[in-house]
């Protein structure tokens, strides 16, 4: 039997599906005790496919390297992985793993691929509604992993990763962790570009299912394009993976230091203070820039160097 919903009915059902995101969100202050590192895809889901490699293998290798670096530098911090081998983990289970361990930060590691083999660069995402068509394309590709899951239409309340209208829900989500997510995204993007000298595709927003349920600051990083032969070689090289892992670990160190030193509140101290902070940020950006995360006003001081949208970027 096929059940059809009107737009209102669809949004009501999908809101019930997304409700845990709102219910579980709460401000976390102080010490970083646990980080969850998510290696994208795995098992029967290869992710993006290059000429000689799979996304799932690159993501796992870099994720394990990042975790090892963090654990070596901070033995007291619990490092949790959503997977440590080539196995398939459902998207909704990844967030649950992070939540069950009460992680303070979630980093999902991926690589990209498009038809145009000249497209290159690194981009880091936070949860939200896409502004650019290219951002939607990336989210659709990553969310398509649910099609490897049994009964995914029921499990995700009718969410279809290939339908743009399914992503309307992300415009309604007011993520209490958006400010801190932007902060770690900026640090990761900056360190990756500095370390690899790759093209800076900036910080972006899109509706990733893997990020929707995590009750903590969360980002998804696309380390490069496996469809670009030069970048595929770099992504698979030991030196390339070490550079990327080192960069992410350095970004984590800076984030940890800032959070523990300031113990800042994730949401604004007051509506006016948050609004003033966002107004100042928006005033410093040109009309074409990507920062449109007005869903939540953040009083966190953060560098927005990489919040520049490449409006002419195309994945086609």
Please annotate each region the language model reported.
Residues 1-10:
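Bacterial N-terminal signal peptides that target proteins for export
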Residues 26-159, 174-178, 182-186, 233, ...:
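Catalytic-core regions of hydrolytic enzymes
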Residues 250-292, 298-300:
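Pro/Ala/Gly-rich low-complexity, hydrophilic intrinsically disordered segments
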Residues 156-165, 220:
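Flexible hinge/switch segments at interdomain interfaces of large molecular machines
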Residues 305-312:
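Conserved small/polar residues in nucleotide/adenosyl-binding loops
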